[in-house]
């Protein structure tokens, strides 16, 4: 039986956070046995914001080592660096020509980022979703694990795929589509996917690009420094303190409970019972202890991989070769259909 194809990726810009791990990377590991997985380090996307070249190269290898430390296995999944598969850029240009200006203008992430990086509102930032569409459609991905901030981009990917299929897909005598050019991807919903919020502003998602580093727990941060951040995390002023899950009225407490549940596997009912009558300090101490233990093990594995650059190079070169074999098949078909000389 053919496995369903899953594609996902992370930008090598900024240090990955426990939100990236608990919300994405850890779930990717569980997919490897049942799905045909491609996990990319999307460095082409990273340069929509100015990057220091030396830092970008280092960060790209850091992310690769973190993938491996988290349990992503190159013998089970295709792991590669986006810029080493030129078909991504080639297909993106073609798809740009089948995407409308107004569609890109409605993308909320472009509006947010252009406001934040107003000194560098470049065309790459504007057409970012088209490159993301190329990333996905190139491999005929069936499912894509995405966060809430990327769901709109997946929808435009589906629109582009359907538009191209309508124009170039094989049709029967009545004009009904019988064979598509691109697989139209679905959003992959993980059974257990933690959404980790900012420590000091728990109504917004934890982001690796947050300028206030006290909001963020980096995967490579010193565990003791992380513990101090957690102990300063926002809760509330209820008196007496009440530790219960209520995202609307107790966002800070709920965020700490979410982190604890994701690491320990305990249910909210179990955690609420465990902390009944206790102070917020007790909750913060337990969260800090669990996060420190998780990070210590992860960082030990990371260091082993990161120090072996020969291994990292072999993995990303082998991964790029495997990815290119698949990507070329799709791109060749697209070029043929639109009339390019082969």
UniProtKB/Swiss-Prot annotation:
One of its GO terms (cellular component) is cytosol. A motif ('KMSKS' region) lies at residues 205-209. A motif ('HIGH' region) lies at residues 12-20. The keyword Nucleotide-binding applies. ATP binds at residues 11-13, 19-20, 147-149, 196, 205-209. NCBIfam families: trpS (TIGR00233). This is Tryptophan--tRNA ligase. It comes from Haemophilus ducreyi (strain 35000HP / ATCC 700724).
